[in-house]
UniProtKB/Swiss-Prot annotation:
Organism encoding this protein: Salmonella schwarzengrund (strain CVM19633)
GO BP of this protein: ribosomal small subunit assembly
Name used for this protein in its record: GTPase Era
Region (G4), start-end ranges: 124-127
Region annotation G1: where it falls in the sequence: 15-22
Family: Belongs to the TRAFAC class TrmE-Era-EngA-EngB-Septin-like GTPase superfamily. Era GTPase family.
Membrane-topology descriptor: Peripheral membrane protein
Region feature G5, mapped onto this chain: 154-156
Purpose of the protein: An essential GTPase that binds both GDP and GTP, with rapid nucleotide exchange. Plays a role in 16S rRNA processing and 30S ribosomal subunit biogenesis and possibly also in cell cycle regulation and energy metabolism.
Keyword Transferase listed: no
G3: region residues: 62-65
HAMAP family: GTPase_Era
Gene transcribed to yield this protein: era
CDD domains to which the protein is assigned, alphabetical: Era (cd04163), KH-II_Era (cd22534)
Length: 301
C-alpha cells in the first residue's frame, strides 16, 4: 500500500457579481464547469469544481456573487449560499475587477474580515485597464484594506497568472485523504450540468433582454439504446412576452440555443445527445421560495 502523503482542501471563490469568478474557476480546472456569461448573477448554485494533480486535490466552491440588494427571494437565497460557503474552507480567493471598487466589493470584504481563512486577492481583468498608471495606486489601496495572504493581478480570460494562484492554493492544502476520485471534475450530477449548459446559452443568445427570471428544469435524462442520452429541458419564464423572446421568430432562437447546448453537452458527457426544449410560463417563481426549493435552488444552503 502506498504511504505517499496526499493533500486536500476546500477553496472558496468569492466576489461581487460579474468580476470573473466562474471564468477563473474554469481556467483553474482546465475546463468549463461553471457557467460564464456577461450578465451579473449567472452562477446560482455553489458548483464545486475539483482539480486533482498528483498528491494535491483542490475542491473549489464557486459562490454566487454576494450583492447588496436582497429584495427577491432568489437574491436572498443566493447571498445566503455565498456567505455559507466562506465558512469552512482552507483558503478564500477574493476576485475584484481591475481598478473598480464598489459598495458590493466592500460588503464582500467586510464578510471576509470576519473569517478565519487566509485570503488571496485576485485582481482580474488587469489587461482591460485603460489607464495603466492607475493600477499601482489601486493595488496599494487594496493592500491597505486587509491583510491579504497575497495580491495577484490576473486575467482569468487569457489565463495570465492563473498558475500563480494554483501554486498558492497547492501550498495551502492540508495533508488529508482525497475526497473524490482523481477523474472527478465536479460533484454535481450530469442532469444539473445539462441545466447549467442550457441556462448559459439562454444568457448568451438573449443578452440583456432576458431578465434573471428564467430557469431550466431537466424533466427527462435517460440513456438511450445508442449509448447516448435523451434529454428534455423545460425553460421556465415569468411572462408570455419572455416566452416569445426565448422561442424567437419562427422558433429560430430556441433552435440555436438547443443546437449550441447539445454541442456542449456532447463534449462534456462524451456521448451523443438528443435534446428537446420547451418553454413554459410560471409567473413569479423568483419571488416564491417554495418554488425555488422545488427547482433545486436551496439544496445546499
Amino acid at each position: 500500500m502506498s504511504t505517499d502523503k496526499t493533500y486536500c482542501g476546500f477553496i472558496a471563490i468569492v466576489g461581487r457579481p460579474n468580476v470573473g469568478k466562474s471564468t477563473l474557476l474554469n481556467k483553474l480546472l482546465g475546463q468549463k464547469i461553471s457557467i460564464t456569461s456577461r450578465k451579473a448573477q449567472t452562477t446560482r448554485h455553489r458548483i464545486v469544481g475539483i482539480h486533482t494533480e498528483g498528491p494535491y486535490q483542490a475542491i473549489y466552491v464557486d459562490t454566487p456573487g454576494l450583492h447588496m440588494e436582497e429584495k427577491r427571494a432568489i437574491n436572498r437565497l443566493m447571498n445566503k449560499a455565498a456567505s455559507s460557503s466562506i465558512g469552512d474552507v482552507e483558503l478564500v480567493i477574493f476576485v475584484v475587477e481591475g481598478t473598480r471598487w464598489t459598495p458590493d466589493d466592500e460588503m464582500v470584504l467586510n464578510k471576509l474580515r470576519d473569517g478565519k481563512a487566509p485570503v488571496i486577492l485576485a485582481v482580474n481583468k488587469v489587461d482591460n485597464v485603460q489607464e495603466k498608471a492607475d493600477l499601482l495606486p489601486h493595488l496599494q489601496f487594496l493592500a491597505s484594506q486587509m491583510n491579504f495572504l497575497d495580491i495577484v493581478p490576473i486575467s482569468a480570460e487569457t489565463g495570465m497568472n492563473v498558475d500563480t494562484i494554483a501554486g498558492i492554493v497547492r501550498k495551502h492544502l492540508p495533508e488529508a485523504i482525497h475526497h473524490f476520485p482523481e477523474d472527478y471534475i465536479t460533484d454535481r450530477s450530469q442532469r444539473f450540468m445539462a441545466s447549467e449548459i442550457i441556462r448559459e446559452k439562454l444568457m448568451r443568445f438573449l443578452g440583456a433582454e432576458l431578465p434573471y427570471s428564467v430557469t431550466v428544469e431537466i424533466e427527462r435524462f435517460v440513456t438511450n439504446e445508442r449509448g447516448g442520452y435523451d434529454i428534455n429541458g423545460l425553460i421556465l419564464v415569468e411572462r408570455e412576452g419572455q416566452k416569445k423572446m426565448v422561442i424567437g421568430n419562427k422558433g429560430a432562437k430556441i433552435k440555436t440555443i438547443g443546437i449550441e447546448a447539445r454541442k456542449d453537452m456532447q463534449e462534456m458527457f462524451e456521448a451523443p445527445v438528443h435534446l428537446e426544449l420547451w418553454v413554459k410560463v410560471k409567473s413569479g417563481w423568483a419571488d416564491d421560495e417554495r418554488a425555488l426549493r422545488s427547482l433545486g435552488y436551496v439544496d445546499d444552503l
